[in-house]
Curated annotation (Swiss-Prot):
Disulphide bridges: none
Annotated phenotype, changing Y75N: In a breast cancer sample; somatic mutation
Signal peptide positions (record): none
Function: As part of the exocyst, may play a role in regulated exocytosis of insulin granules.
Gene encoding the protein: EXOC3L1
Effect listed in the UniProt record for changing A514D: In a breast cancer sample; somatic mutation
GO biological process: exocyst localization; exocytosis; peptide hormone secretion
Region described as Mediates interaction with EXOC2, EXOC4 and EXOC5: 1-370
Keyword tags: Cytoplasmic vesicle, Exocytosis
InterPro entries with a match to the protein in the record: EXOC3/Sec6, EXOC3/Sec6_C
Locations listed in the record: Cytoplasmic vesicle, Secretory vesicle
Name by which UniProt lists this protein: Exocyst complex component 3-like protein
GO cellular component entries: exocyst; secretory granule; transport vesicle
Organism: Homo sapiens (Human)
Entry keyword annotation includes Cell division: no
């Protein structure tokens, strides 16, 4: 192609806008020129050099123009070359398009020719298939017999021979597969079923591994070898792999679980301990069999002992979860399961046995019982035990109450004290339950301990209520007890026995105040028994104190002697109460007698007619105080616990001859007995019968002006328990503040 044609093919270049670089350069040049010119005009001495500047700028402008022309010429030449290359590429593309069109035409002609050769190709393929079949025909004829023989081998559990025969048949099928173009002959249709039958037979043998290891280990070895060989061989393309190793392992696990946990029936109520005991014996034997007999029949990668241990653990855990999801267990079953799962299972009797290797360790697996399971079982055990303990304690109490109406008194121990096995039975029941709970866990022990203390408190309240009913029925005549007081005294010994032995219920490390509610209930029981005994004593003495004080009392000691005799008879069995309770009881009895004595004095039945009677009354008080003190000393009351000397203090009020000194005596009485009131003092002063109203008022005023009682003063409650007389006799002054008011009014 000549240059003229080339020029014709080149497109005409239309003039474009000016270059932005040129415009920017021109602006910069003008700016620089203006700057220089402004400097020249500001400095006239530089005008002489204006010509030089002009010539220099002309030269610079010419140089720039020549450079611009050179750049433009180079740019235009490059554009011209690019246009020429583009034209060349267009020519090449047009030539390629024509060549492709010719090739398409040739291909269409060849496809038509191939269609005419298709029947020939099919004939060739059929010829090849027939040729291959003609070579394999002797072997194919033997396939049905081989299939039948293989089935016989499988039925006879000759796994290795059956597997070899199946592999030969499978290889023959593969040999016919390629020549037949993937077509499977009908003679091989039962081959997959034979493989599945062999797999099931191997699986069944693995499921009975424990039994086969003892009876026919060669059969187990053959089954495992077949599974390993089949798993390790390369699977032909398009065939699903037969992972017989996994099937074998699953069969080992399923067979083991079926042997020990396959029964869907859960142990019946009460049969759980026997079931757990059977597992305690069977599981270690199973692990020992696995280690000694099954493991040598299997490859090392099977980890037979670990597989056995984990399978037994998971099966047992699943069975226990199913058991707990069913009906609520009884107390014995809940305890047996807790103790077995927390102590026996991981102990040296079972999974923690030193005879088992580290492969049998299951301590890192999920525990047999979750925390929720343990909480559920502990709550069930405590609830059932609480019901049983409550019933046992109630039975013990009912048996004790039934004896209170007997014709003979309470039983005694060798020392002569009243005795009953009930306290020992109660504490033994509670202590034994706490001890049994400690065999399981500390948390269960604490739960049972709290339950035991609660039930003991309930028992003590029931015991107290039973005593109240016993007393009420006795005094109302519904059920007269021949030995009412002795059985109350026996109840005091029961309380003492419980108090002295309740410390056995204290847990090691428990807070010191854990037994405080029980001790408070025991103290309340003791106070109630005291009150019942003293009420009986008061009922005995009340008719005698109705004649005290009186003229007969002044002249004869027989009245108080009768009181002492009856009190002595009433208290004759107090010695059968154990110390220190007997001392407290005697002190309370003496105080009850003294209180009745004081109450009788306060009734105002007697007013002395003269100094002789006052002296006689004072002497009677001294004699009565000595007689009461001697009575309770003979009964065994310690001397420092007596309160009968209060009568000696009252004696001084009657024996004092100078009424002006009564204020000092009243103040001294207040010092010794801070709970004495104006009403009491007024009633006692009324016994004298010789006081004027002014003297009476002065004595009462000294009571108010008395110094506070000394710290050593007796703090025993006496006068506050004595009711002040409601009405004073005519010969006596009115009592209390009313008395002072009336005295002032008169």
């Amino acid at each position: 192609m000549d240059s003229a044609a080339k020029d014709e093919m080149q497109p005409a270049l239309s003039p474009g806008p000016e270059w932005p670089e040129q415009e920017r350069a021109e602006q910069l040049a003008r700016g620089a020129a203006l700057k220089w010119a402004s400097g020249i005009f500001y400095r006239p001495e530089q005008l002489a050099r204006l010509g030089q500047y002009r010539s220099r700028e002309v030269q610079r402008t010419c140089s720039l123009e020549s450079r611009l022309k050179s750049v433009m010429q180079s740019y235009l030449e490059g554009v011209q070359t690019g246009v020429w290359q583009l034209a060349q590429a267009i020519e090449v593309v047009q030539g390629t398009r024509e060549a492709l069109s010719q090739a398409r035409g040739l291909l269409q002609g060849m496809s038509q020719a191939l269609q005419t050769l298709e029947p020939l190709r099919e004939r060739v393929a059929q010829h090849k298939q027939l040729q291959a079949l003609s070579h394999l025909l002797p072997r194919l004829r033997a396939v049905p017999a081989a299939v039948s023989h293989t089935q016989t081998l499988i039925d006879g559990q000759q796994f290795l021979e059956a597997y070899v025969s199946l592999r030969e048949l499978e290889q023959l099928r593969e040999d016919t597969w390629a020549p037949l173009g993937g077509l499977e002959l009908p003679v091989f249709q039962g081959l997959d079923l034979l493989f599945e039958a062999l797999g099931q037979a191997v699986e069944a043998a693995a499921g009975a591994a424990g039994k086969l290891a003892r009876e026919d280990p060669a059969l187990l070895v053959a089954a495992v070898r077949v599974a390993e060989v089949e798993t390790g061989r390369t699977t032909p393309l398009g065939q699903v792999p037969r992972d017989w190793r996994q099937r074998c392992l699953r069969a080992l696990q399923e067979g083991l679980e079926q042997a020990h946990f396959g029964s869907p029936l859960l142990p019946a109520p009460g049969a759980l301990p026997g079931w757990l005991e059977a597992l305690r014996v069977a599981l270690p034997v199973e692990l020992a069999t696995a280690e000694a007999l099954v493991a040598p029949c299997c490859p090392p990668q099977y980890n037979v002992v670990q597989l056995w241990a984990h399978t037994l653990h998971s099966g047992l855990r699943r069975s226990l979860q199913n058991l707990l999801a069913g009906p609520e267990l009884e107390a014995a079953d809940a305890f047996a399961l807790l103790h077995w799962a927390l102590h026996v299972y991981l102990g040296q009797e079972m999974m923690g046995s030193l005879e088992l290797g580290p492969e049998a360790d299951v301590s890192q697996l999920e525990p047999l019982l979750t925390l929720e399971n343990i909480e559920q079982l502990e709550a069930t055990f405590v609830a059932n035990i609480q019901a049983s303990v409550s019933q046992w304690l109630q039975n013990a109490l009912d048996g004790e109450v039934a004896e209170w109406g007997r014709e003979h008194g309470p039983n005694t121990d060798p020392s002569g004290s009243y005795y009953s096995p009930m306290p020992a039975i109660v504490l033994q029941i509670l202590e034994e339950n706490i001890r049994v709970a400690s065999l399981v866990s500390e948390s269960l022990q604490q739960r049972v301990h709290g339950m035991a203390l609660s039930e003991l408190g309930t028992f003590l309240r029931s015991f107290s209520d039973a005593l109240i009913r016993f007393s009420r029925d006795h005094f109302r005549g519904k059920s007269m007890a021949p030995h009412y007081v002795p059985y109350l005294l026996a109840a005091l010994n029961h309380k003492s026995a419980l108090s002295s032995s309740v410390s056995v219920l204290q847990l090691d490390g428990a807070p010191s105040g854990a037994l405080a509610p029980v001790e408070a209930a025991l103290d309340e029981l003791q106070r109630r028994i005291y009150r019942l005994v003293l009420e009986a004593l008061q009922a005995e003495l009340q008719p005698l104190f109705a004649d005290l004080p009186s003229r007969q009392w002044l002249s004869s000691p027989e009245l108080l002697q009768s009181v002492c005799e009856r009190t002595g008879r009433f208290c004759r069995d107090f010695w059968r109460v154990r110390n220190p309770t007997v001392q407290l009881l005697l002190a309370e009895a003496e105080r009850a007698v003294v209180l009745q004595y004081l109450s009788a004095l306060m009734q105002g039945r007697l007013v002395c007619r003269g100094a002789d009677e006052r002296t006689q009354a004072a002497e009677r008080l001294r004699h009565d105080a000595a007689q009461l003190q001697q009575l309770f000393l003979s009964l065994g009351l310690e001397e420092n616990a007596h309160c009968a000397p209060v009568l000696l203090a009252l004696r001084e009020l009657l024996n004092l001859r100078d009424p002006a000194l009564l204020g000092l005596e009243v103040a001294g009485l207040r010092q010794q007995f801070p709970d004495v009131s104006e009403d009491h003092v007024s009633a006692l002063l009324g016994l004298r019968g010789d006081l004027s109203r002014e003297q009476h008022l002065a004595a009462l005023s000294s009571l108010q002006a008395a110094l506070p009682p000394s710290p050593r003063a007796s703090r025993r409650v006496l006068f506050s328990l004595v009711p002040a007389p409601a009405l004073a006799p005519a010969s006596c002054l009115p009592s209390g503040s009313c008395a002072r008011a009336l005295l002032l009014a008169e």
